[in-house]
């Protein structure tokens, strides 16, 4: 085989290998582009589950406080009042919140209310995702933060909690308990 023939063979082999490697690279890029949103959404769902766990524990602590004191805490002190009922302060931090401070707010109309005076505890919000990032923050839903897949986690007076999309979440705060 002549040297020129060997060079031509190697050029063809190199071209085939180059095209194959380029094809694999393109396939990898396309696959990554398709899978990235899937992984991002899965990570956000995991953060939502973690937030729900945090809120569930805080809601239980609020219920224990109410059972011990016959009323829910004052809105201006709710976080301080439930701290003794919680394992640690990290429960106040939502994993999806922009700042590492309190990610939740107390529903102000419940301040110093007896749970028995609330006609439908399963329909009245008690704790919700808040954009304020302050301990002991309370309002009437104005700071509601839709940080979980365009929705919010809301805990109710009866202790259950749920993720709500924007329109449904905001509607919960239109009625007074």
Located regions from the model:
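Solvent-exposed helix-loop boundary motif
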Residues: 87-106
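Conserved hydrophobic/amphipathic alpha-helical signal-anchor segments
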Residues: 26-91, 161-174
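Active-site-proximal beta-strand/loop segments in catalytic clefts of secreted hydrolases
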Residues: 61, 68, 94-97, 128-130
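Membrane-embedded alpha-helical segments of small multi-pass membrane proteins
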Residues: 8-34
